[in-house]
Design a protein with these regions (language model features):
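Structural motif
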Residues: 41, 71-80, 185, 328, ...
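Short amphipathic alpha-helical "interface-anchor" segments enriched in bulky aromatics
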Residues: 53, 99, 168, 346-379, ...
């Protein structure tokens, strides 16, 4: 029996090679083909607003006053080199070699008054000349910029809350300062451990630094807390520090008390003893109890206040099979303990600490801004690049604050 095959029913094999109308790449990585880009950036895509922001706050004057220039003398000047890196980060490119995509852009070239931007290697060599001194000066520049923006926005916070947290940046290769430490995503890999502090009210970066990939010691935490006072705006009179258990030590508590800060720090390693008869339940429908006590851990000079929250564990329904009963009452609960010098009910203090959870979102935004990118093998270059990235992050925050202020003012005028 002969079967006739329908015309066009045979499967055709896909040809090898490149297609003329291949879809554009959605991500830029090491294998992406690149050349000089012929497309232009939209003036309404954020870059024009950034240029106007520089003019509004007088960024050039602040830069020349606060920035400590390195020994390398670029042809365009230190301000143009730093502004170019900030613009690259603001656009969304977070690697120095991404300058090849915007080298001929009319808006960037017009801002710097050149026919084309320098090669990407020029910016990399300039970054290679930066070090710890330049990072400190960039942080000072950020402090002056904060004062200027707060003045423009009419912000006068007498009390602020500062959230302190660390993150992990996994590195690949022989990077200076990389260590094996707490890294949940890439266990056993080398990494760096940046330390960051954010202001809760404005969600901006206040102070931080790039660190080796090891746990924060008590002396380092104390030095970091003592340095916060040097970066506070002039209107601030009271500060509440909130940190996780990595920062709990007598050195850090002593530094916070010496600076006059209120603090709520999660417990790590301390075993305070609470009065069994002092547990109270502020909400009847929630199986949550609170307590507080004064306790002096070993090695501490005096006692501090500890507040606790215990949550009843889920009990399995009784079965016909014999089961092991719980020997101690503490095994029936999950405990959350904090060290603080704040007065008030224990549940109010823990509710205040729980508002710190938003710092994880801020750290994630900073990492997407470019904090995850390590441009050099040298630690001093990466240390300076860390502060530049966080300065770009703050500029993005300030532009949103100014835009919100202008929108609110326009709504008030229309309502009146």
């Amino acid at each position: 029996m002969v079967k006739q095959r329908k015309k066009g029913s045979r499967k055709r094999r896909g040809g090898k090679g490149s297609y003329a109308h291949r879809a554009r790449a959605r991500r830029i990585n090491a294998s992406t083909e690149f050349e000089t880009c012929s497309e232009q950036l939209s003036p309404f895509g954020g870059l024009l607003a950034l240029i106007k922001f520089f003019d509004l706050v007088g960024f050039r004057e602040i830069f020349h006053f606060a920035y400590q220039a390195p020994c390398r003398q670029p042809k365009l000047g230190h301000y143009s080199m730093m502004a170019g890196i900030l613009m690259l980060l603001f656009i969304g490119f977070n690697r120095i070699w991404h300058f090849v995509y915007v080298r001929l852009d009319a808006m960037l070239c017009g801002f710097f008054r050149v026919s084309r931007l320098p090669a990407a290697s020029t910016y990399w060599r300039y970054l290679d000349s930066l070090g710890i001194n330049q990072a400190t000066s960039v942080l000072k520049l950020a402090d002056m910029l904060r004062e200027r923006v707060w003045q423009l926005c009419g912000l006068q916070y007498a009390r602020i809350r500062i959230n302190i947290d660390t993150t992990v940046k996994t590195v690949f290769g022989n990077q200076q300062g990389a260590r094996k430490g707490h890294n949940t995503q890439h266990r056993g890999k080398l990494g760096l451990r940046p330390l960051l502090g954010f202001i809760e009210e404005t969600r901006e970066y206040l102070v931080g630094k790039l660190r080796k990939g090891v746990t924060v010691s008590g002396q380092e935490a104390a030095a970091f807390i003592a340095d916060i006072q040097n970066h506070l705006p002039g209107c601030v009179r009271e500060v509440l520090l909130r940190a996780d258990g990595e920062f709990l030590s007598w050195e850090s508590v002593q530094a916070a008390l010496a600076a006059g800060f209120d603090f709520i720090i999660a417990n790590r390693g301390c075993t305070p003893v609470f009065d069994p008869g002092s547990w109270y339940r502020p909400w009847r429908r929630r199986a949550v109890e609170f307590n507080s006590c004064f306790y002096r851990p070993g090695g501490w000079d005096h006692a501090c206040r500890f507040v606790a929250m215990r949550i009843a564990k889920e009990q399995k329904p009784p079965s016909t099979q014999p089961h092991q009963c719980v020997l101690f009452e503490d095994d029936k609960y999950t405990y959350r303990i904090f060290c603080t010098n704040v007065a008030g009910a224990a549940h109010h203090i823990i509710v205040e600490y729980d508002k710190r959870a938003d710092v994880e979102n801020l750290v994630g935004e900073a990492k997407r801004e470019g904090l995850d990118m390590i441009p050099s093998v040298k630690f001093k270059n990466n240390y300076a690049f860390f502060q530049i990235v966080m300065l770009a992050y703050n500029i993005w925050r300030y532009m949103k604050m100014l835009a919100q202020k202008s929108v609110s003012a326009a709504q008030k005028r229309s309502a009146s």
